[in-house]
Amino acid sequence: GINPNRMEWNGMERNGMDIDYRRYKALANLYIGLVHYPIMNKHKEVITTAITNYDIHDIARASITYDVSKYFVIHNIPAQRELAATIMEHWKSGFGSTYNPDRKDAFTGVELVNSIAVAVRTIEELEGVKPIVATTDARTYDNTISYARMREHLENETRPVLVLFGTGYGMTKETMESFDYILEPIYGHGEYNHLSVRSAVSIILDRLRGEAWWNK
């Protein structure tokens, strides 16, 4: 259960019902990153994937919903980062900022960087400590960690966590092996196990930072 001595309570109410025991601020900050290089294609070749408009928008919206401290869009090609910056500026300060102010808010936590290393270094500069780095995969590894254990860390410890999501056919094996943990696969009720990255991000954020509905 939740240890009230280790939590910072938000004191929120919904529909007149006190839900403090389910809606709280975890001690450890959570960061996420969308990786576009080094990525594998279906032939196991190392490639760079393109940034998509949907990935920027939808993951930014999920991030602010689940109180993610920063969402890194990680791309090694300057032209792609410039394209993403142009899209974001439309919603942050252009016509989109007045047409849809909610979208402007969603982009406040998005940062474009050229490598995973820069994302890690940025967090270390902000937090004063190197983050725990985790990623996701449809397979299990020796360093696979459950969502329950990672959520427990976020709720009870202070060291920040960076969860990286791959595009294409996933990050290279060498890159995956350099991380601290790999979150367990997302298992649905059926046999199919090929979610879009946007779906995976939303599911995982809800598991790590969502309302503890099982305590109702």
State where each predicted segment sits.
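Conserved acidic residues
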Residues: 69, 131, 160-161, 180
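Short, glycine/charged-enriched secondary-structure capping and boundary segments
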Residues: 47, 86-88, 147-151, 177-180, ...
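Structured adenosyl-cofactor binding patch, chiefly the S-adenosyl-L-methionine
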Residues: 169-216
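Terminal alpha-helical anchor/extension segments at protein ends
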Residues: 19-21
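RNA substrate-binding interface of SAM-dependent RNA methyltransferases
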Residues: 24-138, 202-214
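Long, charge-patterned amphipathic alpha-helical coiled-coil/hairpin "stalk" segments used as oligomerization
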Residues: 134-175, 185
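Short polybasic linear motifs
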Residues: 4-17
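Flexible glycine-rich surface loops and low-complexity tracts that mediate binding to linear polymers
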Residues: 1
